Amino acid sequence: MVPWRASDDGFVTPDVLSWYRRFADGEPGALVLEATGIRDVPSGPLLRIGHARFVPGLRELVAAVRERSHGRTKLFVQLIDFLAIKRRPEKEKFLRRFLVLRDEHRERLRALDARAEHANDDELRELLVRLPHPTLLALLSAREREDLEHGFRERVTDVHLAHVAELPRVLPALFADAALRAREAGFDGVELHFAHASTLASFLSRTNTRADGYGNSREGRARLPLEVFRAVRERVGREFVVGCRYLGDEAIAGGSPIEDACAFGVEFARAGFDFLSISKGGKFDDAAQPKVGEAAYPYTGPSGHECMPTVRIDPPGVADARGPFGRNLPLARAIRASVRAAGFATPIVGSGGIATFELAERALADGDCDLVAAARQSLADPDWWKKLELGRGEEVRRCKYTNYCEALDQRHQQVTCQLWDRDLSTPDAEKRTSGEDPRRSSDGRRRLDAPPWSPD
């Protein structure tokens, strides 16, 4: 998830440096930097890498992680592109300003109100405003209903929009340029974001019905992600690590299932990706309806719950309930088996609710994956890797999988962990042991970094 610590114009801040230094304290084998935008466009307090001016701050971040991890932690940056999404509008504002009037609107209104026959556009809009809501919804197209009820969202199939039609021509160079900047900043590699609600995830999806050679068939849907990879590889060279994160299952109606993911995995391995990291769900397609004035959030619907499962993910009484623990490992296992059967040794990264040494070790021993990744558990306790290495597992602060952190992300607030907050009331004691007061969130109520820990 995005921690919301960058500046509003996408630069590394002291809070960003502190955030990643704290993760580096635990000396994990690798850290993947948050989703970082490849375009030089306003995107709020999200890190960006779409211009050379972002490189100095990112270089400082790399140096900070190297220092705090004593050089033991490799550092990758996740590169992402995303299409436009708008907040859910007020009904009156949508009808008076945003709705593009069509002949069908006038024809349907004419059957309801004779005044529509000779009404000008402004008068027609006022007639729409006064309609009962169910009647209005029946008059609008499915896409117009979504724009009204959820907010406007671009799709890769909106090829009537020139900038969407041109994505295959534009994206390879944008990703390649961003990857080169990452190399210049000192990162060990990049993770191309092909998962969840990203642009390239939408190209891989079965919902991608583009008819220009970049949709419909598996080959067509994988074409642009592969072209992006080849452009990146050509730009950064063979020694720079280039992997991707993609979905083992979209978990939406009409979306791509594991069979597609296995086929994509083989093609990605054949192309030369250095690793494949597997996730699930997290789509806008089934997101919950946002409040007026807020944007849809891709982790609020069934696919989002599969992406970031909580302890409540399984209904009561389910005999084979897995809960959030290792929930995506079967997907990683299936993809790994397909890649191996095709003769490739590309490492597969398993993730999703891995919070104990036993589960991580079993996933590796059983052949579910070759590498283990853990986000929420590492947020709860950035030192857990070091504690396990030192035989101090009983001191690990275990994630409760309540998604307290995810709820903050949804509200665009600085992400923290509920397990940290109980220490905030004793800053004096912490200052005596660590030499500094805990950094606090902008509202002053939450610590910004995990409590310090020392093996001594």
Language-model region placement:
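Flavin-dependent oxidoreductase catalytic cores
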Residues: 1-456
